[in-house]
């Protein structure tokens, strides 16, 4: 029984890593706010030295997992998109008000938004993994 479980886990992970999701991703399929969050804006990059970590997140699978969820669980997809919009509003607030903020406030806001983005990305990827796991059970 344990051997079957191990093979099942290996199969699930290999299918997930090889691209079980839709490879024909188009920018139009994902709201623009999502791309603004994942790619980051130029004004934010000026204020955070470690912004390269944000752009490395592009390859982490958030977009692919979100597209997968849009097909598997549209209700959860809608909830996650709304959460991404809320984070995007924070970035817009920063862009609009950065001239009135001091350096520490900007850094605090950027770090908070990045943490929220990373947590949401982890939730999206976990939810898509759960759907894949349930398909194979």
From Swiss-Prot:
Domain of life: Bacteria
Keywords: Plasmid
Protein name: Uncharacterized protein YuaC
């Amino acid at each position: 029984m344990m051997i079957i479980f191990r093979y099942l886990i290996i199969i699930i992970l290999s299918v997930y890593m090889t691209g079980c999701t839709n490879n024909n991703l188009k920018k139009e399929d994902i709201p623009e706010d999502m791309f603004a969050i994942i790619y980051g804006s130029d004004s934010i990059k000026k204020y955070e030295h470690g912004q390269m970590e944000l752009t490395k997140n592009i390859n982490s699978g958030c977009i692919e997992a979100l597209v997968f969820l849009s097909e598997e669980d549209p209700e959860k997809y809608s909830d996650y998109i709304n959460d991404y919009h809320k984070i995007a509003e924070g970035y817009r607030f920063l862009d609009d008000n950065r001239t009135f903020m001091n350096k520490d406030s900007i850094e605090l806001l950027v770090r908070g938004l990045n943490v929220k983005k990373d947590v949401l990305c982890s939730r999206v990827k976990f939810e898509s993994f759960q759907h894949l796991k349930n398909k194979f059970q």
